[in-house]
Regions:
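Internal alpha/beta scaffold segment
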Residues: 160-202, 223-247
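Extended interfacial segments that mediate partner engagement and assembly in macromolecular machines
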Residues: 64-76, 83-190
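Short, aliphatic-rich beta-strand segments
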Residues: 206, 213-222, 280-284
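Short, acidic/hydrophobic/Gly-rich beta-strand patch recurrent on exposed beta strands
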Residues: 27-32, 151-154, 218-220, 349
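Terminal RNA-binding accessory module
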Residues: 1-81, 363, 370
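Short, solvent-exposed loop/turn elements at beta->coil junctions and helix N-caps
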Residues: 121-128, 194, 203, 439-442
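Rossmann-like S-adenosyl-L-methionine
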Residues: 2-15, 20-23, 224, 228-459
């Protein structure tokens, strides 16, 4: 069989028109039906491009010259954000970003006949969509003079781009990153090289309480000990205001997972504190806590409102983590049962419930489907189930358990429209219906979007 002749070839230059966007926000141009994906390009724009890579089904190109700009284009704030992929949408007006995210959700649902009539509301955005992240986790490099620097990996590569202003992190976090790097550079420490598995400093993680200003600093090292530990600790404590926790995390594995299993507390407590909707939370190094606090409060408020949580409701919060949604629910419901597979998170959730004087909440560590069946056997009958799963969505065994449980309402908080649509389709087939999905923008300048939807049991 003759090899199919592609309409473009690598290193070719040609003029194109952008007709669409991918779900990652890349521009799409088609040459005789063959799609080219192009960063920093918007629908309606015409440009001269250079073809970078050609595959059987699609290729990648870059813009050499734009002939016509979209009305939805704004000047780039930082080209490094495009090179690294940390701000893939920064060339779009913020209104256009919000519309893009609404359309991403609509397109995901439209792939299923059962969901094509579900109304996707306009995305709830921020008044200022910059400098919002309460958490930084940045790789550390080393320059030709042997000095450490903060950066981020160039997209689809192992090449580290030096960065000091990340644009989307809280400004104090960017300042603290440089302060800590300056301290480390006084002791001639080496940066980890993932190619050779040599060098010490892998990542620097800083978390800051949005409402409290509490700071947690985590030095991730490829080793058992941090040289000059006492002097480095003393310097960081002296120069970082509101330091609540200083930790060395030991990660000696060949992996791109940032945190290792073992950690050593150098100063303070093994947690920092922040607030969410007026509740206090202790947050450990490995605990999940939404990185955009103001928008997380919007997200959780939406979950409470669409679920219409009442004083006689019995609620199960699956994937409950440290209890950030559970405790918000417990302020309204009769009782909340939280389940989470990570036992450390459950210990933190129990401590958070106690700290907030909430006695109507029970936390159990285990697989959600197993624990829910145990609760059923014990006579617990929830009428509301809240889920906030990771990007891979609900495990099929968990979905089976929820269908068997048959709660009146399922409140689904999602960080991935594709798996949300897949899971909604299964639940609709099992006798539920959804009327609306509410997108919320927790990650401005990026293609990521969170959603809240209510699924009601058919009567």
């Amino acid at each position: 069989m003759a090899k199919r002749q592609l309409p473009v070839h690598k290193n070719e230059q040609r003029d194109i028109t952008i007709t669409d966007l991918t779900y990652e926000g890349m521009g799409v141009a088609k040459v005789d039906g063959y799609p080219l994906f192009i960063a920093n390009a918007l629908p309606g724009e015409t440009a001269r491009i250079h073809v970078m890579k050609v595959g059987k089904k699609f290729g990648f190109a870059k813009v050499i010259e734009r002939y016509q700009d979209s009305e939805e284009r704004v000047p780039l704030r930082d080209e490094d954000g495009l090179r690294t992929g940390t701000m893939a949408l920064q060339h779009m007006t913020y209104d256009a970003q919000l519309s893009f995210k609404q359309k991403t959700v609509q397109d995901s649902l439209a792939k299923f006949v059962s969901l094509q009539d579900v109304d996707v509301k306009p995305t709830l955005g921020m008044s200022d969509p910059w400098a919002y992240r309460n958490k930084a986790q940045v790789p550390i490099g080393q320059d030709d003079q042997g000095r450490l620097f903060t950066g981020f990996f160039r997209k689809n590569s192992h090449s580290l781009v030096p960065i000091t202003n990340y644009q989307i992190q809280l400004p104090k976090i960017d300042e603290m990153l440089q302060t800590v790097i300056q301290i480390l550079n006084e002791y001639n420490l080496t940066a980890y090289d993932e190619q050779t598995h040599q060098g010490l400093i892998r990542h620097l993680v800083i978390r800051q309480g949005y409402h409290t200003d509490d700071v947690m600093i985590i030095l991730v090292i490829n080793g058992d000990e941090l040289p000059h530990q006492a002097a480095i600790t003393e310097a960081i404590v002296a120069q970082i205001p509101n330091l609540a926790s200083l930790i060395v995390n030991h990660n000696t594995r060949r992996t791109n997972v940032i945190l290792g299993q073992e950690e050593t507390l150098l100063y303070g407590e093994p947690y920092y504190r922040d607030q969410m909707l007026g509740l206090d939370f202790m947050i450990s190094a490995k605990s999940f806590f939404q990185v955009n606090t103001p928008q997380a409060e919007v997200l959780y408020q939406q979950a409470l409102e669409v679920g219409d949580i009442q004083a006689d409701d019995v609620v199960i919060d699956a994937y409950c983590g440290i209890g950030s949604i559970s405790l918000c629910l417990a302020q309204r419901a009769k009782h909340v049962y939280g389940v989470e597979v990570v036992s450390d998170a459950i210990e933190m959730a129990q401590a958070n419930a106690k700290m907030n004087n909430l006695g109507n909440v029970t936390f159990v560590a285990g697989k959600a489907e197993d624990v829910i069946q145990e609760w059923q056997a014990a006579g617990i009958e929830p009428n509301v189930v809240v889920v906030d799963p990771p990007r891979k969505g609900l495990a099929s065994t968990f979905t089976d358990t929820v269908i068997e449980l048959a709660p009146e309402k399922i409140v689904y908080v999602s960080c991935n429209p594709a798996t949300l649509a897949r899971d909604m389709n299964r639940l609709v087939a099992a006798g539920y219906h959804a009327e609306t999905v509410q997108p919320v923008d927790l990650f401005p300048q990026t293609p990521h979007v969170e959603c809240v939807t209510l699924l009601m049991k058919n009567r």
